[in-house]
Regions:
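Acidic, metal-coordinating catalytic segment for phosphate/diphosphate chemistry
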Residues: 1-17
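A generic structural micro-feature
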Residues: 8-12, 85-91, 114-119
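Short, well-ordered beta-strand micro-motif
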Residues: 20, 96-98, 123-126
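Conserved Nudix-box catalytic region and its N-terminal flanking loop in Nudix hydrolases
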Residues: 22-60
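Short, charged/polar surface micro-motifs in flexible loops or helix N-caps
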Residues: 24-26, 34, 45, 74-79, ...
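Nudix hydrolase/Nudix homology domain
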Residues: 35-37, 103-105, 110-161
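A short coil-to-beta-strand element that immediately follows conserved catalytic motifs
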Residues: 65-74
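Active-site-adjacent beta-strand/loop module that shapes the phosphate/pyrophosphate-binding cleft
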Residues: 79-107, 143
């Protein structure tokens, strides 16, 4: 069971995301319902360690067995999701991921994968051009240039809730 709480006032999500970089590019994704890019990852399951959750999500979404280098950020976000219009309070752990032992780069600059009923499109985005991309969370556009050695708590609020 995913750690999600739905109420009449909004939703709470407990998530993990992977920061996968190569040659000055960041791997981002979107699906057929989202006009914006976001990072690979997903919801943490009840009683699941965040480290296990990110590796599971990367296996599910990308079919890779990756390794965690280190945690980077814990971000608390408050926003209204643009497609569903739901109000969210989200806690997300971001991990720097090593995919050097995977054949991920052989898939090309842009590739798709099926995830149940959804088609996920993955794309390597040049980090120098992120400021012009429709990418969430927005703090990544700036902080990607200064990856912390130790986890940092960040807060991002995109809307008055």
């Amino acid at each position: 069971m995913d750690v999600v709480l739905k109420t009449e006032n909004g939703r709470f999500n407990f998530r993990v995301c992977g920061i996968i970089m190569n040659g000055g590019k960041l791997l981002a994704m979107h699906d057929e319902n989202s006009p914006y890019y976001y990072l690979p990852g997903g919801r943490v399951k009840l009683h699941e360690r965040v480290e296990d959750a990110i590796l599971r999500e990367l296996k599910e979404e990308l079919d890779i067995s990756a390794e965690i280098i280190r945690p980077l950020w814990v971000n608390q976000a408050f926003f209204v999701e643009e497609v569903s219009k739901d109000k969210f309070h989200e806690i997300c752990f971001y991990f720097l991921i090593d995919t050097s032992k995977c054949a991920l780069l052989k898939r090309g600059e842009k590739f798709t994968r099926k995830d149940g009923k959804h088609t996920l499109t993955f794309e390597w985005l040049n980090i120098e051009e992120l400021k012009d991309k429709y990418l969430y969370p927005e703090f990544i556009k700036k902080e990607i240039f200064n990856l912390p050695e130790y986890p940092i708590l960040t807060t991002e609020s995109r809307a008055e809730l």
